[in-house]
Amino acid sequence: MTTELRTRLGAPVVRAPLPVAPSLTPLFAEGGLVRGRTVACTGDAALSAALALSAVATRAGSWLAVVGVPNLGIAAAIEAGVAVERIVLAQPPRASREWITTVAALVEGFDVLIVAPPASLSHHDTRRLQTRILARQSVLIVVDMSALPSLGSPDVFVSDIDVHADTVAWSGIERGGSHITQRTVNVRVEGRRCAAPREETVTLPCSMRQPAS
């Protein structure tokens, strides 16, 4: 079915996947993030992986909304390669109704959303949100920050792709400074929309100070 015919019939138009960094491309059979899907990021490098997945898309013109992620500043997003002029940070109340209303509104204007869901979120709420994500052909990246108070797990969503990212090593401090500049991360991708698990070890930018001894 052609794009024009699909539009006339009211069928969703299939758009090209959102691009990811070359080091991450082998992890995705489609070569990038398929629009309309939900990606769950877990592991100690979950947020770094989420930012890395969305960075190239922002530099290509896509807009990114980061919702409910505590202590994330613009500087950290820039370190990850995100285009600063195409990112919006939002901190809605963590009550499920206010949170879901905020995210649902942002879906209308953003191609990628990185979210840390509140613990109070229900499956009913997430089903409605994912239906909107699919209709709008955005990409929802849910980050596991459940170790923090009042934040929940990605398990409340039905994920299409599961990305597990664990730190293997830090680098930067061996040059004599206290500033960590990079982290080596093992990234494993699997899930119901992934024909077979894929795994890569990649280097991600990082901005951290080594604690004083």
Feature map (PLM): residue ranges:
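Long, charge-dense
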Residues: 65-122, 126
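Phosphate-binding/switch region of NTP-binding enzymes
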Residues: 147-213
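Aromatic/hydrophobic pocket-lining residues that form π-stacking "cages" and hydrophobic walls in ligand
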Residues: 53, 103, 129
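Short, solvent-exposed amphipathic alpha-helical segments in soluble enzyme
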Residues: 55-56, 81-82, 130-132
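Detector for small/aliphatic-rich hydrophobic stretches
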Residues: 1-66, 191, 210-213
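Structural alpha-beta junctions
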Residues: 59-63, 84, 135-139
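A contiguous pocket-lining binding segment that forms or flanks enzyme active sites
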Residues: 107, 111-161
